[in-house]
Curated annotation (Swiss-Prot):
Organism: Polaromonas sp. (strain JS666 / ATCC BAA-500)
Listed EC numbers: 4.2.1.90
UniProt-recorded name of the protein: L-rhamnonate dehydratase
Metal-binding keyword on record: yes
Site (Transition state stabilizer): E339
Catalytic reaction equation(s): L-rhamnonate = 2-dehydro-3-deoxy-L-rhamnonate + H2O
SMART domains in the cross-refs: MR_MLE
Other known facts: Reaction proceeds via a syn dehydration.
Lineage: superkingdom: Bacteria
Entry annotation: catalytic residues: H319 (proton acceptor)
Site entry (Increases basicity of active site His), positions: D292
Gene designation: rhmD
Length: 395
């Protein structure tokens, strides 16, 4: 261990348009259609999520260089705010440390930012640093990240697809399809009727054995979510996802008691750290946890979240995040399948989530991915040199 390199530099960049901020898409993309959101109570912000600024956060690229010249990197969301946090605050805990000091660095970053952090943009940033550290260490050791996490427990990953066309996802070999909920409580009975009509139409198209789920993106209240779940049981809705605001643990516990027997309640995309997920688990808020590894605290924290979930008999199915979640899921028994975000504008083909920003990003084939597709050192991806990185706060 004494010959392990130290960390020489950490640098933070952003990039304009798309990248890791997958909401930053052009017009006509399904992800910016009329989708139910917490802002749906305001008619002027109902038609497009970009209208209220869902795409303003931007991409954060964290690059960490070791004393032997090895470079690890990651991409997440955070933009210029994340760059400022890395360069002005977190760099002091990273530079000069050993590449193996991942746990210590995480602890220092989290505790040093408690007075203005805990969740949100700060945890996105800490997650980005953490992922870059895992990428760096794995490259130094010339191993894939999943080898550092204990190695694969299965030969392949199995995926469900998130997008506007579950019927097409079935033809592509996915085990299920998760639809965005289009109409929230502010659109009243007519909106609820349209939600159920779409679900019924998709059930007709895909048959009885294909999973269908609704992603509600924090936009409902307990009453509406309960009504939706009960009515949707006719169409064999497998789960209702992120129905309530992430801080409403009490509401989630009530909703889980209310939904029809056999239907699952899932959440956690916008939760962070082991302490947030501890609340979800101990209050019996959900059946599946869905942390985003680029937002919840990185791999270091996701390992703790997963252990907590396993002790409570719950599954962990990370939100999106491509290779950053694939390397984790392949090593965990309580993560039996993965999410794949359909980033084609019409959700009609399989394209890499971070295209064109990352090169060598693997994608499912017929809804599956061999473990061997993840065997390159680190997370196995490269930054596209054609993406113009900007470093707003150089030191």
């Amino acid at each position: 261990m004494n010959n392990m390199p130290t960390i020489k530099h950490v640098r933070a960049f952003t990039v304009r348009g798309g990248g890791a901020d997958y909401h930053d898409q052009g017009s006509g993309h399904w992800i910016d259609d009329h989708i139910s959101t917490p802002m749906g109570r305001y008619p002027e912000y109902r038609q497009s999520r970009q209208s209220f600024g869902i795409n303003v956060l931007g991409t954060l690229v964290v690059e960490i260089e070791a004393s032997d010249g090895t470079v690890g990197f990651s991409v997440t969301t955070g933009g210029e705010l994340g760059c400022w946090i890395v360069e002005k605050h977190l760099a002091r805990f990273i530079e000069g440390a050993k590449v193996t000091d991942i746990e210590k660095i995480w602890d220092q970053m989290f505790n040093a930012t408690l007075y203005y952090g805990r969740k949100g943009i700060v945890l996105n940033t800490i997650s980005g640093v953490d992922l870059a550290l895992w990428d760096l260490l794995a490259k130094v050791r010339k191993e894939p990240v999943h080898a550092l996490l204990g190695g694969p427990v299965r030969d392949e990953l199995t995926f469900y697809a998130t997008g506007a066309r579950p019927d097409l996802a079935k033809k592509m070999g996915f085990i299920g399809g998760k639809l965005p909920l289009h109409h929230g409580p502010a659109e009243r009975e007519e909106g609820l009727k349209k939600n159920l009509e779409l679900l019924g139409e998709m059930r007709q198209r895909v048959g009885d054995d294909f999973w269908l789920m609704y992603d509600c993106w924090m936009s409902l209240d307990v009453e509406y979510a309960t009504r939706l779940a009960n009515a949707a049981s006719e169409y064999k809705l497998k789960w209702i996802e992120e129905a309530l605001p992430p801080d409403d643990y009490w509401g989630y516990a009530e909703l889980r008691r209310n939904v029809p027997r056999g239907m699952l309640v899932t959440t956690g995309e916008h939760e962070a750290t082991r302490w947030g997920f501890r609340m979800l688990l101990e209050m019996e808020c959900c059946d599946i946890l869905q942390p985003d590894v680029g937002w919840c605290g990185g791999i270091t924290e996701l390992l703790k979240i997963s252990a907590l979930a396993d002790a409570h008999g719950k599954l962990v199915v990370p939100h999106g995040s491509s290779v950053y979640s694939y390397h984790f899921v392949i090593t965990r028994h309580n993560s039996p399948f993965s999410e794949f975000l359909m980033m084609a504008p019409k959700a009609d083909e399989v394209v890499p989530m971070f295209n064109p920003m990352l090169l060598d990003e693997p994608v499912p084939v017929n809804g599956r991915m061999k473990a061997s597709a993840l065997d390159a050192p680190g997370f196995g991806v490269r930054l596209n040199p054609e993406c113009a990185l900007q470093r707003p706060f150089p030191r």
